[in-house]
C-alpha cells in the first residue's frame, strides 16, 4: 500500500531525485520516490562532470556509488580546433582531479538502489502524479497513479525532481523568473569497441558545432554532438543525419567508429530553455532541472543537480528532521552557489 502519510514524496527518480532521497533519508521515517520511467528506458543524455562534480558527489556521500558504476576516469583530453590539435592534461590538485561520464542507464539505477538501501525509501516506477492536494496555500499531498490504480498520499514535503518540463512546478505556482532561449541542439549515441584511449576525452570544436567522445564504461564510449540551430537551418538536414555525417567525417572519430559499432539509437533534443524557478515554497521544493536548468552544451547540469540536493539536505540537517525545517531563502542560496555556472553557460548559449 502506498497510501497514507510520508514525510517526503520525491517526484522523479533520476539524478536529482534519487540523490535527494538518499540525502534526506537520515532525517525522515518514510520517503516515497515516484518515477514515471521504466527501468529499461534509454535516456539520450550524457552525464559528465569534472573535479567540482566529484566533490559534489563526495559531499552527498555518493562518490563511491558513482565510482562503482565502472566508468573510466579521464585525466586529459585531445582538442581539435579547426585543423589544430592540442593535447591537454588536467591539473592534479588532489584525488578528485579527474573527469567522468556515466551512461544514465547505469548511473540512475545505481543512485536509486543507493537510496533504497537506506531502508526507509520506497521507489515506485512507473508512477505519475495526477494531482496535488493544496490546502490554505500549502502542498499537503498528491494523487498517485501506479499500476493503473490511483492512491492518495499525504506528505510534509513534496520534492519535485521531474525535469525542466515539470507540470507539477506549474501546479505549485513555481513559474520561471529567468529564461534564456538556446539555439543549440544536443545529440548523442553510445558506441562499443572503439580503438580510442580510455583515459582521455576528445573534443572537436568546429564552425557552430562541438563533437565530443568520452569513455563511459567497459569498452564503451559516448559520442555527443552540440549543433547550432543556424547550421541545421542552413543545411536543411535532419540533426540525426548531421550527427552521422559529422562523426563519419571527423579525422579521429570516423576511423574509430568504422572499427567499432554503435550500440544505441541517436537521441537528443533542441530548442531548450535555460530557466530558473523558485527553489521552495509552502510544503514543496524543486531540485535539479525542475528548478534550475542549464543548457547541456557546457555539461554543468549534473553538478547543478547535486548542489541543489545538497542545499536542501543541509537545511534539513540543520533542523535535525524534515518536519519543521525552514526552507525559506533557498532560492537565493542556490542562485548564488551556481551563478558562475549560469554565467558561463549563458555566455556560450548567447554566443
Task: Locate predicted features.
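Conserved Rossmann-like nucleotide-cofactor binding loop
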Residues: 16, 39, 165
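Conserved FAD-binding catalytic core of PHBH/FMO-like flavoproteins
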Residues: 149-151, 162-259, 263-265
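FAD/FMN-dependent oxidoreductases across multiple families
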Residues: 235-327
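C-terminal helical "tail/cap" subdomain of flavin- and related membrane-associated enzymes
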Residues: 314-351
Amino acid at each position: 500500500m502506498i497510501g497514507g502519510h510520508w514525510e517526503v514524496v520525491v517526484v522523479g527518480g533520476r539524478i536529482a531525485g534519487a540523490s535527494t532521497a538518499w540525502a534526506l533519508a537520515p532525517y525522515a521515517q518514510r520517503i516515497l520516490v515516484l518515477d514515471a520511467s521504466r527501468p529499461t528506458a534509454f535516456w539520450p543524455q550524457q552525464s559528465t562532470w569534472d573535479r567540482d562534480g566529484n566533490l559534489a558527489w563526495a559531499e552527498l556521500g555518493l562518490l563511491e556509488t558513482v565510482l562503482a558504476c565502472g566508468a573510466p576516469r579521464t585525466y586529459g583530453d585531445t582538442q581539435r580546433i579547426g585543423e589544430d590539435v592540442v593535447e591537454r592534461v588536467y591539473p592534479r590538485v588532489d584525488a578528485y582531479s579527474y573527469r567522468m561520464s556515466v551512461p544514465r542507464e547505469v548511473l540512475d539505477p545505481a543512485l536509486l538502489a543507493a537510496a533504497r538501501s537506506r531502508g526507509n525509501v520506497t521507489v515506485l516506477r512507473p508512477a505519475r502524479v495526477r494531482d496535488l492536494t493544496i490546502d490554505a496555500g500549502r502542498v499537503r499531498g498528491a494523487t498517485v497513479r501506479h499500476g493503473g490504480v490511483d492512491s492518495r498520499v499525504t506528505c510534509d514535503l513534496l520534492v519535485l525532481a521531474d525535469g525542466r518540463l515539470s507540470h507539477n512546478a506549474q501546479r505549485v505556482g513555481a513559474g520561471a523568473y529567468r529564461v534564456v532561449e538556446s539555439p543549440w541542439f544536443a545529440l548523442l549515441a553510445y558506441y562499443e569497441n572503439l580503438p580510442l584511449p580510455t583515459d582521455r576525452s576528445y573534443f572537436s570544436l568546429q564552425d557552430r558545432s562541438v563533437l565530443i567522445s568520452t569513455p563511459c564504461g567497459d569498452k564503451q564510449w559516448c559520442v555527443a554532438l552540440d549543433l547550432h540551430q543556424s547550421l541545421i537551418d542552413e543545411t536543411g538536414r535532419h540533426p540525426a543525419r548531421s550527427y552521422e555525417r559529422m562523426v563519419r567525417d571527423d579525422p579521429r572519430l570516423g576511423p574509430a567508429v568504422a572499427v567499432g559499432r554503435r550500440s544505441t539509437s541517436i537521441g537528443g533534443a533542441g530548442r531548450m530553455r535555460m530557466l530558473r524557478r523558485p527553489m521552495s515554497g509552502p510544503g514543496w521544493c524543486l531540485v535539479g532541472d525542475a528548478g534550475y536548468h542549464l543548457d547541456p552544451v557546457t555539461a554543468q547540469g549534473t553538478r547543478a543537480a547535486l548542489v541543489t540536493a545538497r542545499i536542501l539536505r543541509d537545511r534539513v540537517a540543520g533542523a535535525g528532521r524534515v518536519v519543521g525545517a525552514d526552507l525559506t531563502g533557498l532560492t537565493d542560496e542556490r542562485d548564488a552557489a551556481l551563478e558562475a555556472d549560469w554565467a558561463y553557460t549563458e555566455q556560450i548559449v548567447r554566443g
